[in-house]
């Protein structure tokens, strides 16, 4: 009890000192100085973006990466990413999103054919522009690529549906470069329940989904809890042996 009183007295003393010091307010920084500071930080540190929808956008626009279409990746008004804007903004390692829509998760193969196609697109970017882009599967890859002046293209898969009902597919996806998996998208799948679906099929993770999380931990694939419902989130937090990520969401909203 005495230790609690001592701690309370210490906190109260600090509060009184803080209130009585009456420091002069700092001059608010102007927009120009803030921009300069931001640019300085962007040069000093490696910056990543957890979710860039370039591969699926190319698929939707029916753009096949080749020598004839390479300029689309250098500078374009189509989409939200190109080399010029990445360099200007100091973006070093944008995660290419291998996005599997809900319609594909219910199809034969659970969307694996689309996943392969989108991964092929990312690999084609590196083949066509090897002086600008490089694949990355580890932090060391990203550091090396950054030192060489290249933008790293790590990959994450949005929607775990392509895992199907075969846990071995996780090894295949890892070997193809996938380093995080968003467990589901806008509808419940075979792994877990989604935040936008009121069905609550599994009341969180399915029995298979629990095995998926454990195998992702073993392989080194990050568990992404964007799009999952509350029950799934809490179950992942209890089950996962590694920190989970929210690749493109805050507590309640998507970025």
PLM feature segments, named:
Residues 1-8:
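Bacterial N-terminal signal peptides that target proteins for export
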Residues 8-17:
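Bacterial N-terminal signal peptides
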Residues 20-200, 254:
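N-terminal hydrophobic targeting/anchoring segments and the immediately downstream early-domain regions
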Residues 53-55, 229, 250:
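Catalytic metal-binding/acid-base residues of hydrolase active sites
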Residues 90, 178-180, 239-245, 250:
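Glycine-enriched alpha-helix->loop->beta-strand junction motifs that scaffold or abut catalytic
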Residues 160-164, 221-228, 252-255:
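Active-site glycine- and acidic-residue-rich loops that bind
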Residues 167-175, 197-245:
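Histidine/acidic residue-rich metal-binding segments in metalloenzymes
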Residues 184, 226, 247-249:
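Generic beta-strand/beta-sheet core signal
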